[in-house]
Regions:
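His/Met- and acidic-residue-enriched segments that coordinate or traffic transition-metal cofactors
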Residues: 1-93
Length: 93
């Protein structure tokens, strides 16, 4: 592995860790409503967005074709679920 490849891999890993921490911060800042269903949807939406963000980092920095394929599948599935949460939350206002 060249130094450049190692740096690229580290950048991807560090970006992923920062994304996880940002997502955790976002989840911690969500004010709980006391409505379990609404709180579940809000928290899961952030959680799913983290999965999308991490998958995009895998596509940008990863090397494994298998992991890149999985990342693409995760992005598609999680975006659909985020849209479902958005639709449900929109009806709760």
């Amino acid at each position: 592995m060249t130094h450049g490849q190692m740096q690229k891999g580290m950048m991807g890993s560090e970006d992923m860790k920062k994304s996880m921490m940002t997502g955790m911060d976002a989840m911690n800042k969500i004010a709980m409503s006391g409505d379990t269903d609404k709180d579940f949807a809000m928290m899961m939406k952030v959680h799913h967005q983290q999965a999308v963000d991490m998958s995009e980092m895998e596509l940008a920095h990863g090397k494994s074709p298998a992991m890149k394929t999985m990342a693409k599948q995760i992005i598609a599935a999680q975006k659909k679920e985020i849209a479902k949460f958005d639709r449900w939350l929109a009806k709760q206002k």
